């Protein structure tokens, strides 16, 4: 049975070659390590960073006579992930042995699921943009399946000049392999897909998504074709461990295949590796087919069966997911899709924003969280969990602005003080005399002084009203930024005789 093409060709995503346009076809197999205290079939710890071969049971080391026992928590996490992907949950699935030899695979086979996975078809919606008009395009990427499998160990080649070592701490750790349909048509779509998938599993608490630790990695399948033609021969780029590298690997591989085809060559179906230092892919081995692995049901494990009540109970307990929160931010708080997307990228950021926005203007809260808080966090290379400004403190700053106690400019200074020194914003304003000047007569005196000292600019302003901004700036400077900007603007217009 052939793969069905569900996407209509889109010229915006075509790649221009010497002999015409090409379309890149992308599918991904993402390996996500399940958050669980113990491994898929043993009680050994899954904690990251231990000394080599410290978290290894007799089962993980494939000692004779050791039988696997399924970890129920891993099954529960896989089903929760399937529900988060709007996927069909299979009440009966089967574990198979995937046979191949590699030094870090002590059993000589991997326990996986082939014909009957625990999770069937689902979908993820990604947003691409904004375009020059500020619009986003929503694209649905199909999920073909999600199955459970064991991770292999780790081969270490850089510790000795003539020997390699094997660390089995990772051997037997539970993985979800999430297989997409070949629905992506650009590196941007692939990066958006990986980002969205990582966000979903983090919201669900089923995988930490830490690609730098290897707990989430992608095998990227890339092929090219002329628009409207059948799919071309695909190459698989193995174990890409960052979203940026996924984009770079696809860009290089698509160009490589196009160059071969335009020279009259043929694409070999093969497995390739991405060399991040060189920004290119290189051949690793010929690509295996399913029959090469000689799959057969694992005789040591019964079929995995559970009832619909088990699935329904997990569905009820699911947290609110990014798409739902984003829709709520847009529809109930009036945020733009762009701002809402930034705020839901991480659960901790969404929670922080909601606390700040509670009882306040949502747009104003979003501006402060996105521009000021996240800007400061990025500058100091901190995560949201490390912020020195609590939601209550940022909320208090916004309240002071809305009350007219401080101006927007003073608020920026106040935020910096709270960021560096902490404290109650309201108390800091009192102690440091940061309240904005609202006394009309005091502001009027400052305006009169600026106007009388700049008669040449007064004449220019009547011909060029945009110079009003210069006068407002001078008054704000003269008052130390404490004057109410709206009042200053109105008084300047009156004094200059400009409507």
From Swiss-Prot:
Recorded catalytic activity of this chain's protein: L-glutamyl-tRNA(Gln) + L-glutamine + ATP + H2O = L-glutaminyl-tRNA(Gln) + L-glutamate + ADP + phosphate + H(+); L-aspartyl-tRNA(Asn) + L-glutamine + ATP + H2O = L-asparaginyl-tRNA(Asn) + L-glutamate + ADP + phosphate + 2 H(+)
InterPro entries for this protein: Asn/Gln-tRNA_amidoTrfase_suB/E, Asn/Gln-tRNA_Trfase_suB/E_cat, Asn/Gln_amidotransferase, Asn/Gln_tRNA_amidoTrase-B-like, GatB, GatB_C_1, GatB_Yqey_C_2, Gln-tRNA_amidoTrfase_suB_CS
SMART domains named in the record: GatB_Yqey (SM00845)
Pfam families: GatB_N (PF02934), GatB_Yqey (PF02637)
GO biological process: glutaminyl-tRNAGln biosynthesis via transamidation; translation
Keywords of the record: ATP-binding, Ligase, Nucleotide-binding, Protein biosynthesis
Recorded superkingdom: Bacteria
The EC number(s) this enzyme carries: 6.3.5.-
Entry keyword annotation includes DNA-binding: no
GO molecular function: asparaginyl-tRNA synthase (glutamine-hydrolyzing) activity; ATP binding; glutaminyl-tRNA synthase (glutamine-hydrolyzing) activity
Subunit relationships: Heterotrimer of A, B and C subunits.
Role, per record: Allows the formation of correctly charged Asn-tRNA(Asn) or Gln-tRNA(Gln) through the transamidation of misacylated Asp-tRNA(Asn) or Glu-tRNA(Gln) in organisms which lack either or both of asparaginyl-tRNA or glutaminyl-tRNA synthetases. The reaction takes place in the presence of glutamine and ATP through an activated phospho-Asp-tRNA(Asn) or phospho-Glu-tRNA(Gln).
Family, per entry: Belongs to the GatB/GatE family. GatB subfamily.
Annotated HAMAP family: GatB (MF_00121)
Protein name: Aspartyl/glutamyl-tRNA(Asn/Gln) amidotransferase subunit B
Encoding gene (name): gatB
